[in-house]
Amino acid sequence: MDFDGWLLGRLDAVKRDGLYRTLRTQETALKTKGQKRQTWASNDYLGLSKDERLITAAQTAMSRFGAGSGGSRLTTGNTVWHEKLEHTIADFKQTEAALLFSSGYLANIGVLASLPQKGDVILSDQLNHASIVDGCRLSKAETIVYRHIDMADLEKKLASVQARNRRFIVTDGVFSMDGTIAPLDRIMALAKQYQAFVIADDAHATGVLGENGGGTSDYFGVCPDVVIGTLSKAVGTEGGFAAGSNIFIDFLLNQARTFIFQTALPPSICAASHTAFDIISDMHDTRRELQSSVKMIKTRLADMGFTVRGGDTPIIPVIIGDAKTAVSAAALLEKKGICAPAIRPPAVPEGESRIRLTVTADRSLQDIDELTEAFDSIRKELNINK
């Protein structure tokens, strides 16, 4: 069999299972294939990616430093904007220091592949993001998975590994597919009791949770040993970061391969991100309005009979069941002007395919009415939840 023939056979199996994926082209923020759409799948929770203040900051930095960084941070790619942003992130996360990565994915891999060592053990939540899973696979430490936000199971497993050199608990702050919040206060208490270090990935919590938008640390009033995050969601730009002690950041700068061998973020992105953090701390009313929209949508969908999950976050998973029905539901929603793609295995467990809604701060009551009316219509057309 030739190379392409072999791959086509594998792709055919993916198609038969209803898991085939394609790209869609966004012509503007509101149009797909020339038609106006309401996008309910964006991670731009606070609408900052379109904020003129961020755009102006990026343009100003680009005119001075150029379109790209031209190298790694350790060679020629380090600018004043990279360092200013790292100081801002550290202040925002209430840590001593921070270090930028080209994405949140690379931040997780860089931390987990370099920090735990042979003889150590990582205790990882069952629903952690793929970047955490991959980072654990690259680590020299053993990984033990505990049941999703099950503190009794975590404690049982912590108690069983007391003979190991070091214990690391790694968790998403907000889980991207379920919208649930890790009980970080209880995790920190267990870590203290069983002498473990805590690594929290705050990708979906930064800017959204907590009085000042500081994430799960702000929400629970605790401080993990390591905080990982991304700039590509509520911050409205792109890139990732790790935050913690000065010594930890110095360690990453010398040991994290995904930092050492990456091309630095463009200075324009750093300037825009720096501006975003200045704005986020003052968006108290925006966060409250966002929470109000989330509660309204969840209540309406649940009243229709949909199985709705999620915590106090902008992520609303609407469980459909099998993958093919979820794809059909997404297609019908799109015909009604609602862009909300189906999420299927391997991103979620078998039998739990879903429409994953994300609510952003720019949603009006009319938008919410149109969304919930569309869901009521597809429920009847597909005989969902009957």
Swiss-Prot record:
Under Gene3D superfamilies, the record lists: Aspartate Aminotransferase, domain 1 (3.90.1150.10), Type I PLP-dependent aspartate aminotransferase-like (Major domain) (3.40.640.10)
> At the top level of its lineage, which domain of life is listed?
Bacteria
Q: Which cofactor does it need?
A: pyridoxal 5'-phosphate
User: Which reactions is this enzyme annotated as catalysing?
Assistant: 6-carboxyhexanoyl-[ACP] + L-alanine + H(+) = (8S)-8-amino-7-oxononanoate + holo-[ACP] + CO2
A Gene Ontology annotation in the biological process aspect, one of them, is: biotin biosynthetic process
Please give the NCBIfam families that the UniProt record associates with this protein.
Answer: bioF (TIGR00858)
What is known about what this protein does? Catalyzes the decarboxylative condensation of pimeloyl-[acyl-carrier protein] and L-alanine to produce 8-amino-7-oxononanoate (AON), [acyl-carrier protein], and carbon dioxide.
Q: What is this protein called?
A: Putative 8-amino-7-oxononanoate synthase 2
Q: Gene name on record?
A: bioF
